[in-house]
Amino acid sequence: QGRLGVSMELRNMSTVDKTLAERGARYGTFMDNARIAQELKGVACQGGSWDKMKADQKEALEVICQKISRIVTGDPDYADNWHDIQGYAKLVEDRLTLIQPTYVKA
């Protein structure tokens, strides 16, 4: 361990390599994430409503699939992933409440 508890190995890595190592420790391997996220997205696209959805709805669901993948392959207690899922869902909800003025949040 070097100064500030940073391992010598980590200090000698490039910035990109450091970022990838940090992300891998937090989220699991990229290959596992890619496989699970793509499978989840594939399932979502098979739903009968997919072709009726607006771009923001599709994108929100795809990003949520990515966040779910990170949760199940990495640190399930990392609150930021759960927070992000809420955020993307809220963006769609906010748009829908503008065009559905009678909608009352439960």
Indicate where each model-derived feature is located.
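Intrinsically disordered, low-complexity regulatory regions
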Residues: 2-106
